A protein has these predicted regions:
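Short, high-confidence coil segments that cap the C-terminus of an alpha-helix
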Residues: 64, 86-87, 209
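Bacterial N-terminal signal peptides that target proteins for export
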Residues: 2-11
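Ligand-binding clamshell of periplasmic/extracellular solute-binding protein-like
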Residues: 69-79, 87-102
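Exported/periplasmic ABC-transporter solute-binding proteins
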Residues: 24-56, 60, 75, 94-95, ...
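A generic structural motif
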Residues: 62-69
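C-terminal motif of bacterial Sec signal peptides marking the signal peptidase cleavage site
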Residues: 19-23
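Surface-exposed patches in mature extracellular/periplasmic domains of secreted proteins
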Residues: 67, 110-112, 174, 276
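Acidic, polar ligand-binding/catalytic clefts
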Residues: 96-109, 114
Length: 284
């Protein structure tokens, strides 16, 4: 009897170990299946809202891919890429930054650039404002303005519009026009120079500044906070083109590069284009 008991005990131990090993293997397989491939997207601040919707739509068919977004001014993002920051896709709010990266060897993956969207600069005020400003021609009536810096695309377009409207002096590089020069041209108005278009939107919608210049797409979902005074004509700003491209990420493995390519293909797809339109972008 003792021998049988010992035998049964030994069998129980062996079975327990086998079950434990099998359980560990299944756990490892489940963990591996849950691991996601990360794609890092550097996108202009004005794309923040629409990108959230795009990522949600993309993940319906690609649950295995995690999109991580870095949103800031296109100039700041370009500098980060030039300095070697890990990035798979760059979505700029202007061609200047993408052109500069294309002029450098080994940054943009050949054949992946798409000049995809068009936007429009707007002059806005906060709801309930008593401003006398009606548009770019009488911006000097504002006591304070929120305007992005010259290295920020919306700031550059604003400066270009002021030059073409005859308010600012013509210059070789409008990006170099300082806020002091703008303030002087507008009769001494207080200028709040913002780091990106999101900061301009916040400054005006919260009433910190009387008027500001943002993109039309930035007014999406802000109808109860922002009032559009003027859609600035393209004749003054030039086209507001958004290019997108895949970046040579030296830290990425082949799986990550493939996932980045799939996401880029989605960004230029007909499905994505309908989403852009919902968020007030035009298709180039």
């Amino acid at each position: 009897m003792k021998k049988k008991t010992g035998f049964r005990f030994s069998i129980a131990i062996i079975l327990g170990i086998a079950i434990s090993i099998t359980g560990c293997q299944k756990g490892s397989e489940q963990t591996a299946s849950k691991e996601k491939t990360t794609v890092v997207v550097f996108a202009a601040k004005s794309l923040n809202q629409v990108m959230e919707e795009l990522v949600t739509e993309f993940n319906k068919e690609h649950e295995e891919v995690e999109i991580v977004g870095n949103y800031d001014s296109s100039g700041t993002l370009m500098t980060q890429i030039q300095e070697g920051a890990a990035c798979d896709i760059f979505f700029s709010a202007a061609t200047k930054q993408m052109d500069e990266l294309e002029d450098m060897d080994g940054i943009i993956v050949d054949g992946t650039r798409h000049d995809l969207l068009n936007n429009q600069v707007c002059i806005v005020t906060y709801q309930g404002s008593q401003t006398e400003v009606t548009g770019i021609s009488d911006m000097d009536k504002a006591k304070s303005l929120a305007i992005a810096g010259g290295s920020v695309p919306v700031g550059k377009y604003t400066r270009q519009a002021l030059v073409n409207a005859g308010i600012l002096q013509q210059t070789g590089d409008v990006s170099a026009i300082t806020t002091d020069e703008i303030a002087e041209a507008l009769g001494g108005a207080e200028i709040n120079e913002c780091a990106n278009v999101g900061a301009v939107t916040a400054a005006v919608s919260e009433g910190a500044n009387e008027v500001g210049t943002v993109y039309y797409s930035d007014t999406y979902g802000q109808e109860d906070k922002l009032k559009i005074l003027e859609m600035v004509p393209y004749e003054l700003t030039g086209d507001v083109i958004y290019p997108v491209a895949q970046i040579e990420n030296k830290e990425a493995d082949e799986k990550q590069k493939e996932a980045a390519g799939e996401f880029l293909n989605f960004l230029v797809s007909d499905t994505a284009k309908e989403i852009y339109k919902t968020f007030l972008f035009d298709i180039k």
